[in-house]
Each structure stands twice: as structure tokens, then as C-alpha cells.
Amino acid sequence: MLVLDSGAISRLSERSQAAVAMILALRDEGLWPPLVPSVVLVECLEGHGGRDAAENRFLKTCDIAESVTEALARRAAFLRRRARRGSAVDALVVASAEPGGTVLTSDPRDLAALAAHAVRVRVEQI
């Protein structure tokens, strides 16, 4: 399973040659569509249709996890406590990738710290 954070969404929604090539490679590997926890939208959108157009177009190709269960929230809280860093959204992204998933991000520092306490979660920089 592939989970995207806000940085990955911003980069992949650019429609650059590199972004298109990465999406095609992920599709070929069976990792598309990715999962995007709905709370990530708070970080990658501005709430303005015009400025959010590229991201909104891109998000139509993703699976949006629209709810955060109590179990997922508690797992994210545990990861955040163990890592001693990262935002609540970052912790939910990593918890959503458990077990055995990959998180794609533009800034791996906090996510890697959280993933160090998760069950077989890899963090890859875009």
C-alpha cells in the first residue's frame, strides 16, 4: 500500500514530466491508486477552488480515507509519543500505512522518525 502526505500530493499534482513518470511507475508496480487520509487535505489545500485546482484534479485519482477510526487515532498517538516529533497529521499518515506500507513524502524527517516505531512502514522521498 502507498500512502501520500501533503508534500507528495503537491509534487505529484504539478504534472511535470518527473511527476507523470513517477505516477506511471507506481501504477506499473501496482501501487496506484494511493491512499490519502482525508486529514492530509487540510495541509495540501487552501480552500480556494482556483488555487487548489491542480491538487483537486490529482486527488480524483487517489483513494481518500474519509474517516479516522478510534483505533487509528490511538495508534497515531502512540507513534507520536514514541517518536517525540511529528504532527498529528504525519502520525495518522504513518499509522495508515501499517503494516507494511510505504509513505511517499517530500520531507521525510518527521515521517521517518514516526515510521521507526511503526510496523514495517517505509518512508520514501519524492
Q: What does each model-identified segment do?
A:
Residues 44, 87-102:
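Acidic, metal-associated active-site segment
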